[in-house]
């Protein structure tokens, strides 16, 4: 067996440990055993007429865990970073391709905010009603005071579809990028800033 075949076999085995049901669902699941924050996402998507494909899986805390999800949904899951300035007075949600490296200096220069850092779990829960590992653009539906500024890497905007969690990291969604931009964001009263990140 070649080295490439071994790597593929190991990745498939890891995927099976995290994804027991490979069915892609397109309807709202029963609420039993699911958090209200997750069900609220499905309710809003239905209200806005936004279709999606849903994949249930074990908790996935990192973008590396999501490789199997990428393959099954035919998308690239977004890397979502919750950031703040040094004074912890301005907050950002950054959506970028999972394979890109995040360089603080590169982003800081573009948005005019020096010394960016990762915001705390407490702010994440307060503003987005999300816990670490489940950060998602869907969390903006909970940011009624517009405390969080959305930043989207231009490569994410170029894709027809994007992948995100519905505020929990046990489910992944495939959504049309245009639906998120033209339907979801206006409804939750959030704009966005396009950024150019090279990861270099």
Predicted regions span which residues?
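Extended, low-hydrophobicity, polar/charged segments
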Residues: 6-200
């Amino acid at each position: 067996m070649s080295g490439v075949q071994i790597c593929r076999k190991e990745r498939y085995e890891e995927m099976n440990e995290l994804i027991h049901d490979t069915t892609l669902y397109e309807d709202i699941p029963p609420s039993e055993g699911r958090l209200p924050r997750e069900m609220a996402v499905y309710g809003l998507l239905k209200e806005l007429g936004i279709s999606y494909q849903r994949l249930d899986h074990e908790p996935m805390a990192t973008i590396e865990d999501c490789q199997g999800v990428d393959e099954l949904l035919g998308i690239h899951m977004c890397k979502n970073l919750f950031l703040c300035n040094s004074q912890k007075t301005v907050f950002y949600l950054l959506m970028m391709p999972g394979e890109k490296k995040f360089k603080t200096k590169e982003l800081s220069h573009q948005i005019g905010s020096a010394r960016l850092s990762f915001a705390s779990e407490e702010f994440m829960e307060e503003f987005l009603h999300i816990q670490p590992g489940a950060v998602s653009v869907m969390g903006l539906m909970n940011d009624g005071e517009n405390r969080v500024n959305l930043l989207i890497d231009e490569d994410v905007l170029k894709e027809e579809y994007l992948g995100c969690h519905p505020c929990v990291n046990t489910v992944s969604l495939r959504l049309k990028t245009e639906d998120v931009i033209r339907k979801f964001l206006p409804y939750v009263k959030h704009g966005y800033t396009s950024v150019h990140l090279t990861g270099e």
